[in-house]
């Protein structure tokens, strides 16, 4: 939008607590049960505590993002002064999750100036299962780090919509294929040298990291890696072994989808009635997800599915409701009513027998 600055990361005004985040994850999982919900955290002191809360909020994947951030939309102050090495944030996150018995139910991804197979091996030993590459991949495609991504003036045509500048782009998909092929080959060679068959076998194995011998520089001997390489000795998993239980198998939408099958499949007009309680969260999200997957953003014809509710609806009532779906609630609704409304209609009315007038 002209005149509106692009700042990364943007503020999220619907998330002020772990409970808010848990509700967002629940909403998104309802819309697309097959999606892996990822939460990105900046590597910093104390990130382990936040990561534990994110794991309890049922995120499927936690990203620990280190270094200064590669996006050209970052404020200069953030690029210069924010962010620490990903090793520090990853190590703290791994130790905290294992200590609290949460590590087995989440995937850990790390990014931040990863460039070589050695970087991948070290990050895996510190606890990561997935690895993000951004800056190095952009450079492979021709990026010259002008940091003009948000100004539409990229001189090599990597990040711009300007047709003349885009003509300067010389990147090819083969370059990326070669880069990651060589990267994987280097990882394979390191694994063979260590004596393991799979990358999974070294995840969380900080005991395999050996400090370099004395190089004669006295200052190096003052650095202690004990905290960074500490390994929590308990019976908890040290890598992802099981999926999160999101509790979406018994939401109100499962019942609605069964009753509204004719409307969803054949666009037949149907009216339904239900009682609803404040434990029924994200009502309509899964229904909308199924309709959107089948018909796209156009949804259903107008007034195809009309659902009337009575009671006190839980959070995110009518979230992401698509065209052709009408919700009428006689009662009250909680936070995030009509969140992300996508063309559907929601009417909330006081109960018929209420005694108040305002």
Label the model's feature ranges.
Residues 1-12, 29-34, 68-81, 103, ...:
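Gly-rich Lys/Arg/Thr-decorated short loops/hinges at beta-loop-alpha junctions or inter-strand turns
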Residues 46-56, 115-127:
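Catalytic cores of alpha/beta
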Residues 59-70, 80-93, 125-165:
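Flexible glycine/proline-rich, aromatic-decorated loop/lid segments
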Residues 61, 65-70, 196-249, 330-333, ...:
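Terminal amphipathic helices with adjacent charged low-complexity linkers/tails
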Residues 131, 139-206, 210:
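Active-site or pore-adjacent capping/gating segments
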Residues 290, 310, 320, 328-332, ...:
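Feature marks extracellular polysaccharide-active and adherence modules
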Residues 303-305, 317, 323-325, 337, ...:
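The right-handed parallel beta-helix/beta-solenoid scaffold, focusing on the short coil/turn
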Residues 357-358:
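Conserved small/polar residues in nucleotide/adenosyl-binding loops
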